[in-house]
Amino acid sequence: MNSRIPEDLIERAHRGKTTKEDALLLLEVPPFELFRFADELRDLAAGDTVTYVVNRNINFTSRCTGSCGFCAFRTDDGKVLSIEEIMEKVREAEKANATEVCIQGGLLPDVGLDFYQGIVEAIKAEFPEMHVHSFSPMEVYHASRISEIPVKESLRRLKRSGLDTMPGTAAEILSDRVRKIICPAKLNTAEWIEVVTQAHAAGIPTTATMMYGHVETPEERINHMLTIREIQKETGGITEFVPLPFMPYNNPVGEKMIKEGRYATPGLEDLKVYAVSRILFHGHVDNIQASWVKLGKKFAQFSLHCGVNDLGGTLMEESISRSAGACHGEMITVDELEWMIHGAGRIPKERTTLYREAHELASRNSRKIAGCGAFE
C-alpha cells in the first residue's frame, strides 16, 4: 500500500526531529494511516506494555481568585479542606494501596507557601513512602507571590518539605494569544516555562499537559508540543505528555462555543492529537497518556492503538472534569483498567509516578480499589 506519509518525514520522526511542518502535514494524512505510524513509534518507545498508577486525586478547595473562562470548578466561597481533612483522604488512599496522591486546588487570596509545605510535610510525616505529586505551576507561582519569594526558592522549599513531583497542568495552550482569551489572569507562557524548568532544576520532575479544543488553531497546538519538547531537550524532567480535550459545558468559553455551533472535539480529532503527540515526542518523551475521564473508557482503550501507552490513574475522585460536563466517572478499579488493557491486546502493568515498576506487582487482579462510596 502506498503511504501518504513522505519517507523523509518518517526518517525525521524516527530520529526525533519531526518539524512543525511535518506535524501539520500529518494532520492531513488519512487517519488510520496516521494511527498506524504512531502505533509503530509507540511500540519502539514502550513495547506492548500499557501502564497505570494507583492514585487518588484530592482537590482541597474550589474557592479561587482566578477568572479562567474554561473553568466550571471554581467558586467564590467553596470549603477549604483543613490539613487533617486532607490527611483523612490520604489515609483512605493508603488503605486502598495507592502509591500516589495528587493534590491541587483553587488559588486562595491569602494563602502562601507555608500552607502547601504544611500539606506535604503532614503527608510525609505519616506516610513517608507515599508519592506526593502535587500543586500546579500556577499554584506555585501564586503562592510565591503571596509569600513574596522567588519561584526558585519556593520550589527549593517544597522539595525540602518532601514534594516528589508536580503535575504540569495550567499549561492549557502555551500561546499568549490564546491565554489572553481563555485565562488572562493566569501566568503567561514564559512564566509557565519558568516554573516548570525551575522545578526540574530543583529536582522535581513534572508531567506536561495540553488542553485543546477551544479557541486555539492547529498550528498553536503543534507549537505547544514543540515548546514542551524544547523544555524536555533542555532539562529531561518531563515524565509524560497528557493531551486533555476541553469540556465545553458549564463555563463561559464553552457556552460561547456552543452558541456558535461548536462543541467538544470530535473523537477522530482527539485520536489525531494523540497520534501526532506520539510522533512529535518520539525520542524525547516516551509516555503519552490518555485521560479515560475525558475520553471515556472505550475510547481511551482505542487510543492505545493510536500512540498512547498509559491510561493514567484510578483517581478515586475527580471533581474538575466532572464539573465541566465529563460523564465517564471519577474512579476505576485496577481490575477494570487491566480488563481494558487486555481487551486492547496489550499487557497491563502498574507503575509508580516516575514510571518505575510498582512494588509487589505482576498483575494484581485479586486486589481491588474501593468504590467511590468508601470515600464519601
UniProtKB/Swiss-Prot annotation:
Substrates-to-products reaction catalysed: 5-amino-6-(D-ribitylamino)uracil + L-tyrosine + S-adenosyl-L-methionine = 5-amino-5-(4-hydroxybenzyl)-6-(D-ribitylimino)-5,6-dihydrouracil + 2-iminoacetate + 5'-deoxyadenosine + L-methionine + H(+)
Ribonucleoprotein among keywords: no
Pathway: Cofactor biosynthesis; coenzyme F0 biosynthesis
Pfam short name (any one): Radical_SAM
Keyword Transferase listed: yes
Domain annotation Radical SAM core: ranges: 50-275
Cofactors required: [4Fe-4S] cluster
Positions in coiled-coil regions: none
Entry superkingdom: Archaea
Cofactor note: Binds 1 [4Fe-4S] cluster. The cluster is coordinated with 3 cysteines and an exchangeable S-adenosyl-L-methionine.
EC number: 2.5.1.147
SMART domains reported in the protein's UniProt record: Elp3
A GO molecular-function annotation: 5-amino-6-(D-ribitylamino)uracil--L-tyrosine 4-hydroxyphenyl transferase activity
Keywords linked to the UniProt accession: 4Fe-4S, Iron, Iron-sulfur, Metal-binding, S-adenosyl-L-methionine, Transferase
Residues where [4Fe-4S] cluster binds: C64, C68, C71
Subunit structure: Consists of two subunits, CofG and CofH.
NCBIfam families: CofH family radical SAM protein (TIGR00423), F420_cofH (TIGR03551), PRK07360.1 (NF005609)
Function according to Swiss-Prot or TrEMBL: Catalyzes the radical-mediated synthesis of 5-amino-5-(4-hydroxybenzyl)-6-(D-ribitylimino)-5,6-dihydrouracil from 5-amino-6-(D-ribitylamino)uracil and L-tyrosine.
Family, similarity comment: Belongs to the radical SAM superfamily. CofH family.
Name of this protein: 5-amino-6-(D-ribitylamino)uracil--L-tyrosine 4-hydroxyphenyl transferase 1
